[in-house]
Amino acid sequence: MIDSDGFRANVGIIICNRFGQVMWARRFGQHSWQYPQGGVDDGETPEEAMYRELYEEVGLRPEHVQILTSTRSWLRYRLPKRLIRQDSKPVCIGQKQKWFLLQLKSSESAINLNACGHPEFDDWRWVSYWYPVRQVVSFKRDVYRKVMKEFAPTALPFQSREHHSNNRRGRRR
């Protein structure tokens, strides 16, 4: 579903464990890592798309997770020119994303990267909360920074305050 500005509606999924770590997944056959994400189909709500993508990409069902929060608004990023398919109609110039923060309620053994037979990812691991902001491909970095900042009070109430106070202290020097 591409809007009149050329942005494809998409959902992003951040899965956290009880230790405040987040699931970080490697794209199949590539060296790039990212959060699970995927398009919103016509007639589908963002929450419905999130649950569909959650199963397709990491094999988790609604009973395996709890929604903690979602972004207040859609966050956008533009694709680099080399990734824009000019021959497709309408032309997609980027993604507009609704993000969801999920708590894994089940054992991590429920995660199955091959649940649908055409895996998006070939590996995953738990990483520290802020790690993905530094590691994601550059054109997604601003969106990752915004979503992580918005979700920090929910995902890491104590660590979030500590992270921000450390940053402030560092700037005064």
UniProtKB/Swiss-Prot annotation:
<comment type="similarity">
    <text>Belongs to the Nudix hydrolase family. RppH subfamily.</text>
</comment>
<keyword id="KW-0378">Hydrolase</keyword>
<dbReference type="GO" id="GO:0034353">
    <property type="term" value="F:mRNA 5'-diphosphatase activity"/>
</dbReference>
<comment type="function">
    <text>Accelerates the degradation of transcripts by removing pyrophosphate from the 5'-end of triphosphorylated RNA, leading to a more labile monophosphorylated state that can stimulate subsequent ribonuclease cleavage.</text>
</comment>
<dbReference type="GO" id="GO:0005737">
    <property type="term" value="C:cytoplasm"/>
</dbReference>
<dbReference type="Pfam" id="PF00293">
    <property type="entry name" value="NUDIX"/>
</dbReference>
<feature type="short sequence motif" description="Nudix box">
    <location>
        <begin position="38"/>
        <end position="59"/>
    </location>
</feature>
<dbReference type="InterPro" id="IPR020084">
    <property type="entry name" value="NUDIX_hydrolase_CS"/>
</dbReference>
<feature type="domain" description="Nudix hydrolase">
    <location>
        <begin position="6"/>
        <end position="149"/>
    </location>
</feature>
<dbReference type="InterPro" id="IPR015797">
    <property type="entry name" value="NUDIX_hydrolase-like_dom_sf"/>
</dbReference>
<dbReference type="InterPro" id="IPR022927">
    <property type="entry name" value="RppH"/>
</dbReference>
<dbReference type="InterPro" id="IPR020476">
    <property type="entry name" value="Nudix_hydrolase"/>
</dbReference>
<dbReference type="GO" id="GO:0006402">
    <property type="term" value="P:mRNA catabolic process"/>
</dbReference>
<dbReference type="InterPro" id="IPR000086">
    <property type="entry name" value="NUDIX_hydrolase_dom"/>
</dbReference>
<protein>
    <recommendedName>
        <fullName>RNA pyrophosphohydrolase</fullName>
        <ecNumber>3.6.1.-</ecNumber>
    </recommendedName>
</protein>
